[in-house]
Structures are given as C-alpha cells and as structure tokens.
Amino acid sequence: MLRPWLRQSTRAARSLPCCQCPRPYSSRLPTLTSPSSSVRRLQTSASESQDRVPLRKQLKQNAKALKAEKRQRRESEEASRQKWELTVGIEIHAQLNTETKLFSRASTSSTDLPNSNVALFDLAFPGSQPEFQVPTLLPALRAALALNCDIQPVSRFDRKHYFYQDQPAGYQITQYYEPFARNGYVDLFGYDGIAPEDGDHVRIGIKQVQLEQDTAKSQEYHPSTQLLDFNRVSHPLVEIITMPQIHTPATAAACVRKIQAILQSCSAVTTGMELGGLRADVNVSIRQRGDTEGVHQYGGIGGLGQRTEIKNLSSFKAVEDAIIAEKNRQIAVLESGGVVEGETRGWTIGSTETRRLRGKEGEVDYRYMPDPDLPPLLIGADLVSELANTLPTSSDELIGLLTGKEYGLSIEDAKPLVELEDGARLEYYQDVVDILRDLQQDQDPKSRGGLARVAGNWVLHELGGLLTKADLPWDAERVSALSLAQIIDHVQRKQITGPTAKQVLAMVFDGDTRAIPQLLEEENLLLRPLSREEYVALAEAAISQNPQMVEQIRTKNQLGKLGWFVGQMMRMGEKGRVEAPKADAILRELILG
C-alpha cells in the first residue's frame, strides 16, 4: 500500500524547483536536506498528542453528544408539532375472501400458474360482458357491518378510466358515486398503539366502503421487461375510505392495523399486509394550527392544506414512516416559502424521503361514468339483518370483558388472548377457566375470584412459552384444557408447588398421557407438608452457613437478605416440600426473635 504513494512523492519531488538549494538544478533526484522543503515526509510512528482523550472519556462524550442531539431533535419536532397540524386520510384496498372473481366465474386462487385463471371478460375481449358474482357480496357486507357502516339498499357501479398495462379494459369498475356502504367508524384505544397525544380513545370515521376490481400483478425485469399475471385482474376488492381525521403517524398505522384485524375477525379477508392481501394509500396535508383559512376540502372537512397521496404502502411501519417523511417534507417546503403541490408520491422501505411519481390526476381526469353493462345492486334488509346477527363479537368487546370484573385480566394479557390464532387460544382459555371454577367450587369465594387471572398466566406464559421454545404452532390438544385446569387446581390447593406444576405441564406437553392425579401420585410429586420441627432444623442449618449475614439482618434490619436463607432451605429440603412463606416465618422467628 505504501509503494505507490512513495513513487508518487518521488515524481513530485523531481518536478519541484529547488530554490532553497545553492547547487544548480540537476536532472537527477536531488538530496533534500532543507527542513523547509515542500516534499512530504513519511511518518511511520504515531506522534504523541498532548491532548489525547482516554477511550472511556471519549465514549462518554460521544454518548452525551448523541443524547443532546436526540433531545434537540425532540424539541424541534415538538416545536414543529405545536406550529403545524398534520391531517391524514387513508384508503385501504383489501382482497375479499371469495372463490370467484367479481365479474367472472374464474377462480381467485393465488397459488396457480400465472395467467391460468382468466376469463374472457378479465382480458377485455371484445363482446365479453361482466356478470356480477353474488357470493362476492357476502364478505363485503360482513366487512362493512363490522366497520359500523350503513348498508345502502341500492348501489351502482361506475367506470374509472385510465390507461395502464395492468388494466386491459382501459377502465376499472368501482363504486365511486353510489357505494354499497357509508358512514361507518372504527374506534382506536391505547392498546391499539395510538399516539399518546391522541389520548385514550380516538374514533375515525369511515366515509364509504365500495366494491371494485383488482388489477393485474406486474413484475419488472431490468432493463425494460415487464411481465403481467392476469390471475389477479377482477379479484374482488373492498376499498375503505376513512375521513381525514387522523393527526399523528402512529395513530394512522394503528388505524390500518385495527381495520385489518377487524376484516380478518369476520372472515372478510384471508390475508393481510404481510402477504399482499391488503394495501394502503395515505393522503397527507399540513396546515398551521388554528388556521381555518385553507382552501381545500376533503370528505366534507374544510380549511385543510393541499394534500399529497402516497401509494401502495404494504406494511404498518411503512404507513407510519411514509407519513413522517411526507410531513417533514411539506413543513420544509412551507417554511421555505414554497407551495405544496397536489401530486402522487411513492415510498421505499428504509428511505427517509418520499419521491414524486406523477402530478395528481384530478377526479375529472378519470372520466367517471355509470357502467352501462351492470344493473343497480339491490341489497335486502333481511340479508343485512342475518349477517349482522352472525358477526363475531368485536375484539374491543372481548377485551373489555376480559379486563372487567369477571376475569380481571390486564390489557397485556387480554389483547394477545383475543388476537392469537384467530381466537382459538381464547376459546381454550375459556374452557380452562370454566373447568377450574367447577373444580374450585368448595374453596373460599375470595380465593376463587382470582382464578381467571391465574389461568390466563398459565395459558399465555407457561404453555405459550413451551410452544415458543419448541417452535410449534398452537395445538389445543397437546395439553387438554382439563389437564391444565387440574394442574392449576392442585397449585391453588397447595398440593404441589409452582415449580412442580411447571414440571408436570412440561411432562404432559412432551406426551405423557397419564391423568394428572395419577401422574402426581406415581411420580411422588404431591406436596407432603413438613412439620414445624423439620422447618426449624432446615432453618438452623441455613443460618449456620452464613452467621455474618445473620448479624447484618439483626443489626442493620436488612430483611431482604432473608430470601437467601429461604433459598438455602429449599435447596437443602426435599424437592417441592419446602414452602417459601412458612420458611420465611420460621427464619424471622429464629433470627429476629
């Protein structure tokens, strides 16, 4: 590495005028002895710096500087938030859970070969006509009802005209003017992940829910090849349009997450963002707080700033990050005296800026018009009533029930019980609680009051931990609800200790098919209480091991150190027979008198 540098320095030295040297210039390499010569000297050893900073001090300085930078950034963001108001509206496109396409009998399977599930109408063959598939309406209605929408008895289909290779007809069939559902809402709570500044509860209005076609799936190959799979053309979609009532990026992401969970809970969709079954577009605008003079109006809300649309966001994090980036961009434009343009922008995962895709096409550019080939869609009140009565209980109601007086679970336990395995674990938990309450009927009502909380801990953390460790999916048959309830029952009756109960659970999890009472008896795991004399003997043996700690407890009242002696007693005693509260009481008696 040094040789090229040396050669370069030598060549440079040859070309220098030797004005300091009294000898005439020679074409040969001169001997450079003057300290004022401009030739660089190669230094092979580090010079001693008198102000060298020790590594530890340097790390502390760097950490302090980073902390100060973060604090300054937070203060800047807070100042910006106080001055500027963010407004966000969301459009969610979700693939419906149907076997056929919206206007043809072709299959909606996503696993078949490309271009193998395509009808003539999907490819816009001349003379082909749309044929509305009635079964596709059912999951759409379930979605709209779960979002608290008013179902319209009459709705109509419109053509949205644009030219792109993924839409062979040159237009998309949608419901722009008369959608089948309007005026819904979604409630967001703290446990949904909304921003702290939004409080404990936010209600976001749903302007409308409409049926529409999906487009073809395209794959680009560098430099100029693009392949199209028309299997996805005319796949039934619902487009869910929220009101522009969101004011923080975190709440926007929480809204998309909550809507996806609602759609999945009512079987309206089969896949979410993680598999491409749901996509989101966000409309972002900025205005000064308190400014009602804005000229723009969206969804009936006026006084807003110029909006930009960010298309095709495919994850919750992308929704939040893209909004943050676009908010910062618009604020920078406005603070520099510029004007925000109405346009469509894109977002790349990992980026810190949105990018311009095209100028925003106005509604008139799409040339919306009623579809002349499709009759009005009539929806009967009896169908709506039947579907409404068969909807599952909402997650918010379930969480409210689980955190209420009857079960007393924390939000941290209630939420995963509702969300995991599409409610399968919640059903298992309910079975465990019901069996356990029956087993504990002869016990004190006060102690029975906490059974639901205890069962929640065992279902989520103990059994769930075994599944996670073994990298296995949920299986309610692996440990039956009866077996788990009997294990908890024995713990509550103090017939086995907590560690023994976990050992028994692991044995059943690993395939032991014996009934719990039989297993405990045959493995000699039942707790046979120690006598007072046995506790005293163990305590005296533990005390003799560390008289210095005993003195600290007596003279300095360091009662926390009693736990060490309790642990020693449990290790010295027969496994599972020493009860910590009783051991602690004996130790206090012997040490403190």
Curated annotation (Swiss-Prot):
Belongs to the GatB/GatE family. GatB subfamily. InterPro entries: Asn/Gln-tRNA_amidoTrfase_suB/E (IPR017959), Asn/Gln-tRNA_Trfase_suB/E_cat (IPR006075), Asn/Gln_amidotransferase (IPR018027), Asn/Gln_tRNA_amidoTrase-B-like (IPR003789), GatB (IPR004413), GatB_Yqey_C_2 (IPR023168), Gln-tRNA_amidoTrfase_suB_CS (IPR017958), Gln_synth/guanido_kin_cat_dom (IPR014746). Residues 66-80 have a biased composition (Basic and acidic residues). GO terms for cellular component: glutamyl-tRNA(Gln) amidotransferase complex; mitochondrion. Subunit of the heterotrimeric GatCAB amidotransferase (AdT) complex, composed of A, B and C subunits. Its EC number is 6.3.5.-. Keywords: ATP-binding, Ligase, Mitochondrion, Nucleotide-binding, Protein biosynthesis, Transit peptide. This is Glutamyl-tRNA(Gln) amidotransferase subunit B, mitochondrial. Residues 1-49 form a transit peptide. It is found in: Mitochondrion. GO terms for molecular function: ATP binding; glutaminyl-tRNA synthase (glutamine-hydrolyzing) activity. Its main location: mitochondrion. PANTHER family: GLUTAMYL-TRNA GLN AMIDOTRANSFERASE SUBUNIT B MITOCHONDRIAL AND PROKARYOTIC PET112-RELATED, GLUTAMYL-TRNA(GLN) AMIDOTRANSFERASE SUBUNIT B, MITOCHONDRIAL. Residues 27-42 have a biased composition (Low complexity). It comes from Aspergillus oryzae (strain ATCC 42149 / RIB 40). Pfam families: GatB_N (PF02934), GatB_Yqey (PF02637). One of its GO terms (biological process) is glutaminyl-tRNAGln biosynthesis via transamidation. Allows the formation of correctly charged Gln-tRNA(Gln) through the transamidation of misacylated Glu-tRNA(Gln) in the mitochondria. The reaction takes place in the presence of glutamine and ATP through an activated gamma-phospho-Glu-tRNA(Gln). It comes from the Eukaryota. Disulfide bonds: none annotated. It catalyses: L-glutamyl-tRNA(Gln) + L-glutamine + ATP + H2O = L-glutaminyl-tRNA(Gln) + L-glutamate + ADP + phosphate + H(+). Residues 27-80 are annotated as: Disordered.
